[in-house]
């Protein structure tokens, strides 16, 4: 039996929209409008993503991956980390009441 990973990050992972806003847009000299046009989505969708109000979806990840030369998994894994953190924070009191099983 393997030992589970019980370590927990102390802070919320960086939202992929923040990565886009702080790293990718400046590095590629992109505006919101140019990014929206490049990936063929609305400026509103990009704005919501950049502000962390929208998640990177399975439909958006290949668009971003193609544009920036990385993988859809890069974007989805970043989003998954945020989603897991948010879910764990929302139910942490409930989870704390669960008694772990012990092996015989």
Q: What is each residue range found by the language model?
A:
Residues 29-48:
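Short alpha-helical DNA-recognition segment
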Residues 48-51, 77:
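Base-recognition residues in the alpha-helical recognition helix of bacterial helix-turn-helix
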Residues 76-104:
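Short, charged recognition helix plus adjacent turn
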Residues 26, 37, 66:
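Alpha-helical residues within the helix-turn-helix
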Residues 5-30:
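A short, Lys/Arg-rich alpha-helix, primarily the initiator
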Residues 1-3:
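General marker for long, soluble alpha-helical cores
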Residues 53-66:
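Short, basic-rich loop-to-helix N-cap that marks the start of a DNA-contacting helix
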Residues 42, 53, 68, 79-82:
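The DNA-recognition helices of helix-turn-helix-type DNA-binding domains
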